[in-house]
């Protein structure tokens, strides 16, 4: 429901207020249910595979759009999966060019808060934010992907940088934040999405 997105809206508006004099407003609206799934992001994709997928995804988005959808600045396709049948989700992705994304989420009330983290992460990709974690290991990259890189001792961190994706517990372990309350948006991410000049 639209009310489930209010947490994400408020989080982003409060984060933006730390960087901008003028308020930034986010309005998230749940669209209609679609019958055709977006093209799957290829596993271990070559550059050519990624380009082909990107073109297919843009074509999919163009074909799915109807006049009742209005003219959103960003369109995220939310793919919900039953955690009883799917233990792990494939990687979500969003494209800055075209401002579209395919977001994989769990369809369970107990996963709502973690879904908000994934949704906010992918939404910021659509506005130009870059990942700040090692794609091979999933670990946040120091210092860019750390919420508090100056902390002494460095570990364990208490929060995740949103685009770092995980809370670093040691140099080789991390955990997913349980909710947006355990994330921050650092200066580099704020600059990438235009909140800092």
Which residues does each PLM region occupy?
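Stable alpha-helical elements in mature extracytoplasmic
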Residues: 4, 8, 115-119, 123, ...
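Active-site-proximal segment of zinc-dependent metalloprotease catalytic domains
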Residues: 61-136
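Structured segments of extracytoplasmic/periplasmic soluble domains
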Residues: 7-18, 123-126, 130, 169
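Residues that form or immediately flank small-molecule/cofactor binding pockets and catalytic motifs
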Residues: 31-33, 81, 108, 167-168
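Propeptide-to-catalytic entry region of secreted or membrane-anchored zinc metalloproteases
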Residues: 1-69
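Intrinsically disordered, low-complexity boundary segments flanking structured domains
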Residues: 12-17, 60-66, 86-92, 144-153
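Metalloprotease/metallohydrolase-associated module, dominated by Zn2+-dependent proteases
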Residues: 92-96, 101, 106-110, 138-197
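A broadly tuned preference for mixed-charge, low-complexity surface segments
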Residues: 25-43, 121-140, 172-182
């Amino acid at each position: 429901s639209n009310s489930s997105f209010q947490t994400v809206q408020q989080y982003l508006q409060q984060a933006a207020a730390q960087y901008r004099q003028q308020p930034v407003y986010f309005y998230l609206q749940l669209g209609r249910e679609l019958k055709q799934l977006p093209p799957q992001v290829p596993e271990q994709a070559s550059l050519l595979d990624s380009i082909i997928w990107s073109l297919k995804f843009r074509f999919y988005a163009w074909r799915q759009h109807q006049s009742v959808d209005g003219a959103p600045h960003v369109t995220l396709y939310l793919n919900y999966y039953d955690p009883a049948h799917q233990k792990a989700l494939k990687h979500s992705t969003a494209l800055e060019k075209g401002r579209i994304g395919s977001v994989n989420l769990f369809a369970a009330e107990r996963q709502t808060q973690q879904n908000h983290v994934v949704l906010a992460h992918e939404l910021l990709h659509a506005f130009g934010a870059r990942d700040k974690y090692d794609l091979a290991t999933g670990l946040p990259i120091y210092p860019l992907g750390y919420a508090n890189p100056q902390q002494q001792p460095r570990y364990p961190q208490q929060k995740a940088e949103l685009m770092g994706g995980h809370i670093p517990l040691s140099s080789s372990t991390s955990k997913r934040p349980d909710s947006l309350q355990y994330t921050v948006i650092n200066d580099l991410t704020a600059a990438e999405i235009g909140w800092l000049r």
